[in-house]
């Protein structure tokens, strides 16, 4: 159970009490440490501490010497006992260790004093007064903590309590300026003091904890086989630490508790934490010196201590889970902010403050942890385990709690880490005094962390706790108005900036998790971490202003945390989220809600876990910018935990001064870490309803909870502290394996930068990573250029953070990457770093603090204000792009595996018009679970998708996230080096030499463009810098990580840009853009409605995935094309020119050039493309123009050659030569000098001999063509050649002569004359008996010409007609037939042509066809004659082709001849076709009498009937009847009978009816209605049946009426007059046919014989029933057939 805090003013709750206590603490005096004996040392002690630090930094030897000096007497003996024995430490041993502790404590005190002085000096440099106060406070608190720890080591609990009170008072005094923070800090300090007391008791119980609190702080021990020991706040818990076989490997004896306590403290009060952190840093520095010796002692006892520690840890975790939720809630916002501030400050004062902060924070955390529930403490513990820095911070408290066990563990870690720490300390000490201490701690943390990769199990539990806490936060966390007492802004107020800082401690306690636990916790805490990250970012914003003061302390603490986190921040993404949530554990619900709200506003999601960490770090360094709210935009905090951890550690080194100076703190490792994290596109949320949205955000959305920069200014004291805490938490989370590596990697970027930068900058040597838990850190950031530079980096830069991550740093510290940074995606960070760096370089944010000092009026506007920025969906562009979602939700290990030891490169495609503000930030995305933390981070991301999905705010207009996303996977595969070089080249080569980023004002003064040096970031100016981060080197585990690209818009108040998304929300964003006015102005084109106005009439073009309007002009709209081309050419924008190319290609591939085609437009377009070096597009257009026979000018061709030669585009030469040859072949004429110039250019490009030879061949060919042209144009010479060919009968040569003349003759008249001469030549002298035909040989030669065209066919056809007439005249049918066959072979349709000479030149078409048909007939080719007729379409005389009567007569005779021949061959169809086309049938105007054709048709009809061709017979009969051609009735009756017998009743009835109309049968009208039918006996049975049908239908009414059944229907078989000569047999046969007719009817009819009339004619009666039945079945069709006429 935790001890109740001592009563007194120091413990007074509420802001007043805290303020009073802070004021007391701030009271000046030599006993700034609170009057504690050891701490009361004057400057002499500080000097001694400095000297000791200097000794510790040079190397292990010095450290060991310091340790030996420090450890004297019983202390040494105790250590020996401990080292000699690894079993359970006995009480005596513990006492010995404590004695050693006491011996070492003075050294620690001195160290603290030195660090205090350093801090004080640094603060004096700061332009803002708040810094000095904070630093003093931190020193005081650190001294008091040291005193308390000394007393604890002595076992004087009572004295410790008194000291605690003093410390509280001092802290309260020091924190007087920020009343709210002071109150929170005071409470936190009280808790810390109490917790320290308890820890001290525990320490007494566990005497094995010999190391001083400082030493313990520095120790983080990770055992793969051991579980992480969460240290409960209560001493009893620590004593009863149970062993947890969770597999948590990290055993941080006191680091865990300290972390927990520190976080709790940070959550409660940033200010208190800061002083404590400073003290802790000092203590830690002292501890670093003592570590080597103590580590030896601890190593001997590790085995025994681990089980104890594990038990205690388990126990503490259990107790923490059950204890102190309410206190934690009380401290939610303030503590979180404090932790963030502390972390930032910690990173600023990384070395000095780090130690002091560690002790202070650990003490404060211990207290806070006591106040908080054990669960929170446990979470913190796990987080502490995660981040070595956090462990170090938590060591003091841990010392008290898990005194002996944790000390042993710490000792072991220290031993392991000592060498690393020494190296790191040396590296750090060189650049910065603070760095030495911080590096030591980092190394210690690293080694410890590296030892316990299995810790993730416990982290998982802690994450779960964090989740629960975050859930609580979600429920309870609302955007609270700062407690500073200064002006507050309502949620809807325009004064509240979009980048609202999280008032609650945004840092999750997850940062306290051990790496192993972090992994497990990541899954659970991802949402929280994300939220916390967002909080961190916001808090950083708030903190940045106040952090400038508190930043030193908090940054020191953060440094430790971040260093530790760096180790774990390999899984930094998850860690970061965890960190954010750690402070939330206290106010878990609030924090979670805050996280959610923040992540909403900042668009920080699970993906942004790392970004949040980065943002925290950045906010630490760039608190001012963060305060602006831009920090919130950055969201880089979560982007890369690892980077942030590194950054945090660095940032911790960074002092307030640096923050105040706004100098960008260059932390390459931090940048890497930032890159590792998934940076959601941090965009200022646009809220439809400011009030509503703000409330939602504040109350429960937990997606975004931001504080206005104004509030930040007001709340700097309080909110900054919270932010520092949250940042510290973040850094703790980042403290994973990455933290250590980060510190090593980090090197001072720019000493020239403000002191803030120098302080903040921490050099991290590659060895640091190596010394870290494993080589994994190096794997992650093994590449020096690897920096978490994506959104995270951007966030840092934007924040004005001293963290202008320097690629150089990262490069310097390839080992920066923690082993577990596998989770962290350096590749993505690299990629992001580059692109983000570019974007960030363009982004600039006003510094609130600086503006305040300069008396500048800063107007804070909520970017979600619809009045100002339009209404966006859900108050902001929900950045739910596929990539962010992937990074958040699908943070599956598999995704992380995409990048195999390759640098993930996420290019952010930015159009030239992108404002510098518009910064696309790449989200590192979830890191592969290879790092336990990364795995959990992925789960966490998945768990808290809405944070990731929360709107990014505004995205750069020009930035195309889709592109970024599309290329993301490939870039991940890409190498960091490539991207790094690419990025560096793009940014500025000058900066490569300088190795710094130069800040240049962008279009918007708020935007700063940072130049990338050789992987280094420099912050030369206090202006807000955008971190350009070179691509991170994704090594080892990072290979598996996948980066998710995010677009981050860090614009402060600029125009809103729209991020192109590849998801269904694109349309909504499109609408938003439209509302906001993001679209560019119309280009002024008059585009028809059916075409997309965005595609044609805007610079950006159409962004709709499915546009209902056309993007390519349709046929007939060539004028639109030309107008578009002209406009685009005038504007001369690259994107428009490319669009013009697409339109040109799409249109002219489908449609040929029309009347609106302008060759000058084509030439201008090609020139514009050449100017923009779009050679590929030029080739495409030229090739297409050749196809459509629209050749560009010769000047364009020469310009293309010049461009290729100038640009040395050797690869383009083959394609260019091909185009050149095509142009020459198409008719382009070049002079010899042009050829010589082209050859010269080709030599410059070093073209091959073959290519140059091809050009020379074209030259010779063109010259020959010109020579032939001159010769061909000589008509006289051509005619002479013609005569020569005629004389020799060389018709083949004549054909070649024709081809040459055709190619060279310019005048068509001359060509016609020449062709007429050829026709005459071919027809003369052909009277001989030679079988050959000159025309055929000539036509064969001409037809073989490859350039043979329709003109040639026309000429050959006309010459052939002349030859045909010639042979027809001579009756040489065979030769004429050959001519016609050749024309048929060549598919020359001569029927539509006329001859060239003679009468055929004026012949009608009918005549030409007649001649040809006659030739075929005379030659015996009936098919040829029919072919000629069909080809001529049987045309005789038409208005278009008139002819004379002789031609018609000739045609009639010809067709009759053909008909007789075909009919003789039984070709009935061909005969009928010929007869149908006889003159008189085609044209009604023809005066030919068609009745004359009766014989022909009847002959054909008879032939068809005889051959039983019923179909043809029926067609002929119908045609004859229709044309009124007399028909033979006998043929017609035969046809009807044949059709009936063939059951073709329809045609039989039709023809019978026609026959009746023609008079073929006697009329029936008179007899039908008398119920009497007269049937001639000569009719066939078919004809009789048809007559009966007509009879029944005519009398149907009488037959069907009732009562008429008695009526009789009589049928008389009439004898014909002319049949009298016929015998009775014929009549009897007629009777039988009648009976048969009745039978074949369907249904059958019954005819009954009645009598014989006077004429001896048989009379029959038709039975009524049968007739009635037939009518019922057939009346429907019978009525139509017989009662109605067909015409």
Swiss-Prot record:
TM ranges: none
Residues of the signal peptide: none
Biased composition (Gly residues): 31-41
Ranges where the record places region Disordered: 1-132, 596-632, 938-969
Amino acid composition bias (Basic and acidic residues), ranges on this chain: 80-113
GO biological process terms held by the UniProt record: cell differentiation; spermatocyte division
Entry GO CC: cytosol
Protein name in the entry: Protein TOPAZ1
Provenance organism: Macaca mulatta
């Amino acid at each position: 159970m935790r001890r109740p805090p001592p009563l007194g003013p120091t413990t007074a709750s509420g802001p007043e009490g805290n303020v009073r206590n802070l004021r007391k603490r701030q009271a000046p005096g030599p006993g700034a440490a609170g009057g504690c004996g050891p701490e009361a040392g004057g400057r002499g002690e500080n000097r001694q501490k400095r000297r000791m630090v200097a000794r510790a930094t040079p190397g292990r030897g010095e450290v060991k010497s310091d340790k030996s000096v420090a450890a004297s007497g019983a202390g040494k003996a105790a250590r020996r006992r401990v080292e000699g024995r690894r079993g359970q430490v006995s009480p005596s041993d513990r006492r010995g260790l404590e004695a050693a502790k006491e011996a070492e404590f003075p050294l620690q005190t001195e160290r603290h004093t030195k660090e205090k002085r350093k801090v004080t000096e640094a603060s004096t440099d700061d332009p803002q007064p708040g810094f000095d106060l904070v630093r003093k406070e931190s020193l005081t608190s650190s001294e008091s903590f040291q005193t308390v720890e000394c007393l604890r080591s002595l076992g004087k609990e009572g004295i410790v309590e008194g000291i605690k009170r003093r410390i509280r008072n001092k802290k309260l005094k020091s924190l007087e300026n920020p009343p709210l923070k002071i109150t929170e800090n005071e409470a936190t300090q009280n808790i810390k003091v109490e917790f320290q007391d308890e820890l001290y008791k525990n320490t007494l119980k566990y005497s094995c904890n010999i190391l001083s609190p400082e030493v313990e702080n520095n120790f983080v021990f990770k055992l793969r086989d051991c579980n992480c020991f969460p240290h409960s706040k209560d001493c009893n818990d620590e004593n009863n630490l149970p062993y947890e076989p969770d597999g948590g490997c990290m055993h941080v004896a006191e680091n865990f508790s300290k972390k927990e306590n520190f976080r709790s403290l940070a959550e409660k009060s940033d200010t208190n934490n800061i002083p404590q952190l400073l003290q802790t840093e000092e203590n830690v520095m002292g501890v670093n010196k003592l570590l080597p010796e103590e580590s030896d002692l601890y190593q001997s006892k590790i085995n025994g201590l681990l089980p104890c520690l594990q038990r205690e840890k388990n126990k503490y975790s259990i107790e923490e889970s059950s204890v102190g939720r309410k206190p934690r809630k009380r401290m939610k916002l303030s503590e979180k902010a404090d932790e963030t501030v502390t972390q930032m400050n910690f990173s600023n004062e990384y070395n000095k403050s780090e130690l002091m902060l560690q002790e202070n924070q650990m003490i404060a955390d211990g207290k806070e942890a006591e106040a908080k529930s054990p669960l929170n403490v446990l979470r913190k513990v796990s987080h502490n385990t995660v981040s070595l820095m956090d462990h170090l911070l938590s060591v003091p408290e841990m010392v008290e709690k898990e005194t002996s066990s944790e000390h042993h563990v710490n000792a072991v870690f220290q031993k392991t880490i000592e060498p690393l720490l020494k190296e790191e300390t040396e590296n750090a000490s060189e650049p910065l005094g603070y760095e030495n201490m911080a590096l030591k701690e980092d190394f210690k943390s690293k080694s410890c962390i590296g030892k316990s990769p299995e810790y993730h199990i416990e982290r998982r539990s802690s994450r779960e706790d964090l989740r629960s806490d975050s859930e609580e936060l979600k429920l309870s966390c609302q955007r609270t108005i700062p407690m500073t007492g200064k002006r507050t802004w309502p949620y809807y107020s325009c004064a509240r900036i979009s980048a609202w800082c999280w008032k609650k401690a945004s840092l999750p306690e997850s940062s306290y998790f051990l790496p192993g636990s972090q992994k497990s916790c990541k899954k659970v805490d991802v949402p929280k971490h994300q939220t916390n990250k967002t909080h961190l970012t916001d808090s950083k914003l708030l903190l940045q202003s106040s952090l400038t003061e508190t930043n030193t302390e908090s940054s020191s603490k953060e440094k430790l945390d971040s260093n530790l986190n760096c180790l774990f921040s390999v899984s930094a993404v998850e860690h970061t989220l965890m960190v954010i949530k750690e402070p939330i554990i206290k106010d878990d619900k609030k924090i979670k809600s805050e996280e959610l709200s923040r992540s909403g506003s900042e668009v920080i999601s699970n993906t942004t876990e790392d970004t949040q960490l980065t943002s925290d770090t950045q906010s630490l360094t760039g608190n001012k910018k963060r305060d602006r709210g831009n920090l919130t935009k950055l969201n880089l905090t979560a982007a890369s935990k690892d980077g942030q951890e590194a950054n945090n550690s660095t940032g911790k080194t960074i002092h307030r001064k640096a923050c105040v100076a706004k100098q960008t703190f260059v932390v390459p490792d931090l940048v890497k870490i930032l890159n590792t994290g998934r940076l959601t596109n941090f965009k200022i949320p646009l809220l439809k309803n400011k009030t509503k949205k703000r409330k939602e955000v504040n109350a429960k959305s937990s997606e975004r909870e931001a504080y206005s920069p104004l509030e930040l200014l007001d709340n700097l004291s309080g909110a900054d502290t919270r932010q520092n805490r949250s940042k510290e938490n973040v850094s703790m989370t980042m403290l994973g394996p990455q933290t250590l590596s980060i510190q090593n990697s980090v090197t001072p970027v720019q000493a020239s930068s403000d002191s803030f930068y120098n302080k903040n900058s921490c050099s991290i040597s590659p060895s640091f990573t190596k010394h870290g838990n494993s080589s994994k850190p190096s794997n992650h950031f093994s590449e020096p250029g690897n920096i978490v530079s994506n959104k995270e980096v951007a966030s840092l830069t934007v924040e004005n953070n001293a963290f202008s991550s320097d690629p150089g740093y990262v490069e310097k510290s390839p080992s920066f990457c923690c082993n577990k940074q596998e989770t962290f995606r350096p590749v993505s960070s690299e990629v992001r770093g580059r692109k983000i760096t570019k974007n960030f370089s363009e982004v600039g944010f006003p510094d609130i603090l600086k503006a305040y000092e300069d008396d500048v009026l800063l107007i804070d506007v909520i970017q979600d204000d619809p009045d100002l920025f339009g209404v966006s969906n859900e108050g902001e562009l929900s950045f739910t792009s596929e990539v962010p979602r992937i990074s958040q939700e699908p943070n599956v290990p598999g995704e992380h595996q995409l990048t195999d030891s390759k640098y993930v490169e996420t290019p952010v495609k930015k159009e030239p018009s992108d404002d510098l503000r518009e910064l696309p930030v790449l989200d590192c995305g979830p890191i592969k679970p290879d790092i336990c933390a990364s795995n959990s981070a992925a789960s966490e991301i998945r768990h808290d998708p809405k944070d990731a999905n929360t709107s990014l705010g505004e995205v750069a207009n020009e930035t195309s996230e889709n592109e970024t996303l599309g290329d993301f996977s490939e870039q991940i595969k890409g190498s960091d080096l490539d991207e790094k070089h690419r990025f560096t080249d793009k940014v500025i080569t000058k900066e490569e030499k300088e190795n710094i980023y130069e800040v240049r004002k962008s279009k918007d003064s708020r935007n700063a463009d940072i130049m990338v040096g050789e992987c280094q970031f420099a912050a030369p100016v206090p202006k807000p810098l955008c971190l350009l981060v070179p691509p991170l080197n994704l090594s080892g585990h990072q290979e598996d990580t996948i980066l998710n690209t995010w677009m981050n818009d860090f614009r402060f108040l600029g125009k809103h840009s729209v991020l192109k998304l590849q998801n269904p929300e694109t349309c909504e964003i499109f609408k938003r853009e439209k509302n906001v006015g993001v679209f560019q102005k119309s280009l002024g084109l008059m585009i028809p409605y059916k075409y997309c106005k965005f595609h044609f009439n805007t610079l950006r073009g159409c962004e709709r995935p499915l546009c209902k309007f056309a993007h390519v002009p349709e046929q007939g709209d060539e004028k639109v094309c030309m107008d578009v081309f002209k406009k685009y050419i005038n504007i001369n924008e690259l994107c428009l020119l490319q669009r013009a190319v697409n339109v040109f290609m799409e249109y002219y591939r489908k449609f040929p050039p029309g009347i609106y085609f302008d060759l000058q437009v084509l030439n201008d377009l090609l020139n514009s493309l050449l100017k923009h070096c779009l050679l590929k597009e030029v080739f495409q257009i030229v090739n297409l123009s050749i196809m459509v026979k629209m050749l560009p000018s010769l000047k364009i061709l020469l310009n293309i050659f010049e461009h290729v030669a100038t640009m040395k585009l050797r690869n383009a030469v083959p394609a260019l030569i091909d185009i050149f040859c095509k142009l020459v072949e198409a008719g382009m004429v070049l002079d010899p000098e042009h050829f010589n110039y082209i050859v010269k250019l080709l030599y410059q490009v070093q073209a091959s001999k073959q290519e140059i030879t091809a050009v020379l061949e074209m030259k010779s060919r063109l010259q020959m063509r010109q020579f032939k042209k001159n010769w061909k144009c000589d008509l006289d010479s051509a005619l002479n050649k013609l005569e020569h060919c005629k004389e020799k009968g060389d018709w083949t040569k004549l054909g070649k002569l024709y081809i040459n003349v055709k190619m060279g003759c310019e005048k068509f008249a001359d060509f016609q004359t020449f062709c007429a001469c050829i026709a005459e030549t071919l027809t003369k002298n052909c009277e001989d008996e030679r079988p050959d035909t000159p025309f055929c040989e000539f036509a064969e030669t001409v037809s073989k010409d490859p350039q043979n065209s329709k003109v040639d066919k026309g000429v050959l056809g006309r010459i052939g007609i002349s030859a045909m007439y010639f042979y027809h005249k001579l009756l040489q049918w065979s030769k004429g037939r050959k001519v016609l066959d050749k024309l048929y072979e060549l598919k020359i349709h001569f029927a539509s042509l006329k001859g060239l000479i003679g009468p055929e030149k004026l012949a009608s078409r009918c005549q030409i066809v007649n001649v040809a048909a006659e030739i075929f007939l005379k030659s015996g080719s009936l098919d040829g004659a029919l072919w000629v007729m069909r080809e001529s379409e049987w045309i005789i005389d038409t208005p278009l082709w008139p002819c004379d009567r002789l031609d018609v007569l000739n045609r009639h005779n010809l067709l009759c001849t053909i008909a007789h021949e075909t009919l003789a061959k039984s070709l009935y169809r061909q005969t009928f076709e010929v007869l149908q086309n006889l003159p008189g049938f085609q044209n009604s105007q023809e005066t030919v009498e068609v009745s004359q054709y009766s014989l022909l048709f009847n002959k054909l009809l008879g032939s068809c009937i005889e051959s039983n061709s019923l179909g043809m017979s029926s067609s002929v009969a119908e045609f004859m009847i229709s044309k009124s051609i007399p028909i033979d009735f006998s043929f017609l009756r035969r046809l009807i009978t044949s059709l009936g017998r063939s059951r073709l009743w329809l045609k039989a009835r039709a023809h019978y009816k026609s026959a009746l109309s023609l008079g073929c049968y006697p009329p029936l009208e008179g007899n039908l209605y008398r119920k009497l039918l007269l049937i001639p006996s000569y009719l066939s049975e078919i004809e009789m049946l048809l007559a009966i049908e007509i009879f029944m239908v005519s009398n149907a009414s009488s037959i069907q009426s009732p009562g008429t059944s008695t009526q009789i229907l009589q049928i008389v078989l009439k004898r014909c007059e002319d049949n009298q000569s016929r015998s009775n047999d014929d009549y009897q046969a007629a009777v039988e046919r009648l009976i048969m007719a009745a039978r074949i009817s369907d249904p059958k009819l019954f005819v009954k014989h009645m009598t014989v009339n006077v004429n001896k004619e048989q009379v029959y009666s038709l039975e009524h029933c049968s007739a009635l039945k037939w009518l019922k079945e057939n009346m429907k069709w019978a009525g139509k057939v017989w009662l109605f006429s067909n015409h």
